[in-house]
């Protein structure tokens, strides 16, 4: 396995400074944000698609630091009633760019439709009641399977071998059953981006999920989570309070190692090794208490320390 950093982890820095921090942290790969939910602060998708010199410049900057592209990230809302069409084009653009850069994997999200033709936002159904909600969910699955059958074929035509869905709440594909459902319908090009942070707050077991998914694990995000027990006790995990006030929330994203320690991360990495996963472990830093740079560096340091204790793991240029 190989340490990678998602470039939005250092979104406040210029591309030059961001790549310097990533290399300094000990990573050997980057997951490049190309648009969708991200503003893509380090690259311009249209320019890279149309300008070979711009692509060569990017590759040169990576090579100079001993970095490679582990994946392109186009996490998006492809069925959003307002911005869905735009995001579908971003996903297709990411697939085209991946082919030009000889990258075989994109990281994205399934999306979630609204509740009808006049919707203004998504409608995520997570509870099997009332019955009209279940009927809506069934219609949403038809729409989702149609869209991703088309997008998977488009990706295959452009050399994409893996489409990694982040198992993320507010999207139709968010857990093991939903991932396996869409993978069964479309095929093995579809797999999971396993991010433990989103699983923790829903009380899923990331290690059990790794074993259940097996070779359907296409990508891994390293992000931690910490519960605020006082707030959890009175508000529960379904907490709609803003991330701008972390002290008032039931849970918050944390730098790897600051929410869970070796008791989780060691068996998690061993589980990945056990299913034969030999790809990037990509840091995604969203810690409200750390700066972008410090959170990324601390996450890398912790992850490399844990990985160094796991036998026969090639995890960085230094180990």
Task: Indicate residue ranges for each PLM-predicted region.
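Active-site beta-loop-alpha junctions enriched in small/polar residues
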Residues: 6-10, 33-37, 74-77, 111-113, ...
